[in-house]
Amino acid sequence: MDYTKQPILFKIRKAARYVRLYGVRRTLVKVKGQYHSTRTFATLPAERAERTGRHVGILGCGNFAFSHIAYYLRKNYGSVIRGVMDPSIHKAASLFEEYDADDYTTDAKRIIDDPQIDLVFIASNHASHAEYAVDALAAGKSVHIEKPHVVRYDQLERLCDAMTRSPGRVTLGFNRPNSAIGREIRKQLWSQSGSSMFNWFIAGHAIAPDHWYYKPEEGGRVLGNLCHWTDFVLQLVPPEARYPITVTPTRAEKSDCDIAVTYVFGDGSIAAITFSAKGHTFEGVRERFAAHRGNVLISMDDFKDLVVENLDRKQRISQLFRDHGHQEAIRASYALVRPRDGKLNEGVTREYVWQTGDLFLRTKDALEQNRVLVIESGEPPTSGGGGGGGGGG
């Protein structure tokens, strides 16, 4: 839904609701982000002379880059953005102007080859994420790759291979596990032993059939949306207990929304993810999570309210605003190149990049083929080896 074209009363109600959910500053930048996406310039702004302290590049200047990546970079570190790129020169110019960057362009190579840039945030169209990441790693840059980091197995293999060859480090844009509530969920569940039960219900926006997500090369909504929750459940299962993973789809006409998927992990843990997209959700994506391991029962709503029960103890955590972990994700990525609390972030491992990508790619296969699939192992292939993640069932 294009909020800029809605009646004024709708806009007022939407903004007022978001102030309650996110606070005034976050709501303001979200509103600006909506207008940024459609802004055009009669005369493009002049580029600025090179200035010291600006060392970050952004590839893709859509709403997410504007209202999350650039916003949290400036909030935490000031004016550190050196150059930005988008296929739309107007979006690039808008982000450049709002966040006081030095350079804007439609040429990704100009950002990747800039010697002043040592960290690249990739938030472009999904099919380009891995391609830009491989090029940036080859140029010695560290990279933050927004989800999904790949849309095909050949990209996953090339990305993992590039990680072994580059001095650059990598982070992925799966923000939820590192939110305050996400960290608390994992801490509480990992205080117990044995297998777990996880249940996600997600209500997302319906999007038009001609939306760019649905272009064959972009991977659809499993890779564009569902990967957030496949990654979350993967990270809740201890690495040594994950494999094999049995993926069972439940679907009707569609293969990437109004669907459910269940996973049985190697230790007997079971996860169910239900993704509904039937209309407009006024408060944004809605999420409800429940889990049980040992004596711990978890219930969570919208990364705002969490209830933890352990035998006779009951703990309620209610945050003032929703926090999906975006700020923490940006701060962790910035620490790839600038120390945080005295040390650099080493980034994610090649094994994790493979495993979370393999899981959402196999989930997409299972839903499209409407059959059970088994992922036998989480071991990345050797350089030049074949992919595919596992056999069918």
Residue ranges and their predicted role:
Residues 77-96:
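NAD(P)-binding Rossmann-fold cofactor-contacting core
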Residues 99-144, 148-162:
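Beta-loop-alpha module in the N-terminal Rossmann-like domain of NAD(P)-dependent dehydrogenases
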Residues 209-286:
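Rossmann-like dinucleotide-binding domain that binds NAD(P)(H)
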Residues 150-209:
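A contiguous active-site-proximal alpha/beta segment in oxidoreductase catalytic domains
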